[in-house]
């Protein structure tokens, strides 16, 4: 009985160590980009902020998942960039005005995917922006996502959250250092 108790304590301690290491890794990843880039998407306000070299460069409205679980919360990276990506489910070619993905796609490695399931993209329904309507992606106005696409590099960290905090306060959560104006 004593051996079982000791093994349980060891497993519990290992579990705590592993979980703390995962969170520390996310914080360190954000910290390494502290003077470079960070995208924060706040599902509470349905807004996206892009920070570059300690300054906010872009802040725009977005659309996110129609239910809580559709757009994953967490810390991810941009893993691919595609102009005029086809909409495979509807067999709609890239560049077609019917394409719900719009003109630009920034693929995210959310939920262990390789950037082909979750992304930040344009749309074919400008009235959807600011609402909870997507199947999990983050939609932007086409002009806004084109501007973001031109500035963001593959590897840019992306934090998706649901928070009442301001973007300035959220940069502190992700250890991103803002420059004084």
Where are the predicted features?
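Exported/periplasmic cell-wall-interacting domains
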Residues: 30-34, 82-181
């Amino acid at each position: 009985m004593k051996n079982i108790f000791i093994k349980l304590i060891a497993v519990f301690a290992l579990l705590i160590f592993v979980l703390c290491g995962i969170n520390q890794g996310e914080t360190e990843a954000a910290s390494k980009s502290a003077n470079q880039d960070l995208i924060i998407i706040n599902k509470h306000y349905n807004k996206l902020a892009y920070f570059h070299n300690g300054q906010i460069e872009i802040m725009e409205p977005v659309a996110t998942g129609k239910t809580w679980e559709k757009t994953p919360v967490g810390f991810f990276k941009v893993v691919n960039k595609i102009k005029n990506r086809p909409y495979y489910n509807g067999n709609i070619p890239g560049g077609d005005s019917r394409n719900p993905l719009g003109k630009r796609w920034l693929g995210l490695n959310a939920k262990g995917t390789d950037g082909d399931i979750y992304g930040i993209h344009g749309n074919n329904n400008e009235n959807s922006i600011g609402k909870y309507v997507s199947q999990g992606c983050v939609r932007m106005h086409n002009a806004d996502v084109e501007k973001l696409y031109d500035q963001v590099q593959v590897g840019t960290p992306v934090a998706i959250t649901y928070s009442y905090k301001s973007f300035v306060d959220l940069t502190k959560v992700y250890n991103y250092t803002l420059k004084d104006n």
